[in-house]
């Protein structure tokens, strides 16, 4: 049976862990060839070899390195069909606006928002030449909702991703290029586990708002990315694609006693 990404070439930033790694595996399972971009030089080559793809160490805040990444994909595989701009950080220094310093603010904006701008800017010429392509930018459910457990720069950066994605999705729609934001809910990734290990109360405060009663697994988010990257989503663009277990539409979540 032919995979939904058969013959496509996907570039995945932040591809060595969490959602990025799960997506790289899903893409290959669906027939794509992948280029994995990350700063993790210890694991990147091994992961790429495991998946039959290639790895390029890439600082996504560096324009020259981002341009080299997409040039590498084009030169190696002949096209760039899907760009999953997924690299991101959520450092402990990013907290309430009253506690977050300007340096922490700038660092998060550079990695989470400026990198998406750089990746879109670098890949669009290849997709325009091809007359087709799918760009998926990782945002977050926190850009849709407010949260008292604040990460002010993270939230603002993801809001910027949503706005930029909508504009690009509309601007390039007639050129055969689709641009969508992926908005995951809380996901069971190393990044989230590290964050919540330091603050179990914060984890509990978030989990109680998820109607499904659990965090997503990376593979569940990867399924959504594969859908958005495939021709099955051919009439979907400029959207905020929520994969959040119902969190963003929940006011009161269900109790087991509700079903007695």
Task: Name each model feature, range by range.
Residues 125, 170-174, 234:
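Alpha-helical segment proximal to the catalytic Tyr-Lys
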Residues 181, 201-232, 236, 243-245:
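C-terminal helical subdomain
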Residues 94, 237-260:
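Short C-terminal tail/terminal secondary-structure segment
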Residues 140:
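Residue(s) in the substrate-gating loop at a strand-loop-helix junction
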Residues 120, 157, 165:
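Active-site helix of classical SDR
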Residues 9, 16-17:
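Conserved glycine-rich cofactor-binding loop
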Residues 94-97, 101-106, 206:
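Substrate-binding pocket helix/loop in short-chain dehydrogenase/reductase
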């Amino acid at each position: 049976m032919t995979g939904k990404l058969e013959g496509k070439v996907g570039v995945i930033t932040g591809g060595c862990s969490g959602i990025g790694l799960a997506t790289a595996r899903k893409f290959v399972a669906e027939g794509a060839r992948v280029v994995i971009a990350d700063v993790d030089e210890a694991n990147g080559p091994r992961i790429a070899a495991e998946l039959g793809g290639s790895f390029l160490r890439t600082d996504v805040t560096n324009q020259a390195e981002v341009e080299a990444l997409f040039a590498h994909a084009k030169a190696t595989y002949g096209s760039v069909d899907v760009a999953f701009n997924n690299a991101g950080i959520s450092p402990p220094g990013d907290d309430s606006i009253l506690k977050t310093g300007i340096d922490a603010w700038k660092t998060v904006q550079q990695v989470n928002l400026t990198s998406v701008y750089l990746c879109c800017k670098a890949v669009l010429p290849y997709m325009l030449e091809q007359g087709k392509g799918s760009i998926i930018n990782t945002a977050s459910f926190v850009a849709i909702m407010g949260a008292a457990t604040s990460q002010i720069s993270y939230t603002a950066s993801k809001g910027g991703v949503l706005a930029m994605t909508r504009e690009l999705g509309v601007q390039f729609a007639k050129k055969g290029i689709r641009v969508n934001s992926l908005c995951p809910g809380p996901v069971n990734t190393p990044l989230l586990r590290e964050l919540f290990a330091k603050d179990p109360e914060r984890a509990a405060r978030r989990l109680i708002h998820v109607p499904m009663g659990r965090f997503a697994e990376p593979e569940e988010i990867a399924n959504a990315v594969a859908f958005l990257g495939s021709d099955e989503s051919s009439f979907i663009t400029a959207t905020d694609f929520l994969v959040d277990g119902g969190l963003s539409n929940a006011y009161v979540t269900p109790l087991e006693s509700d079903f007695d």
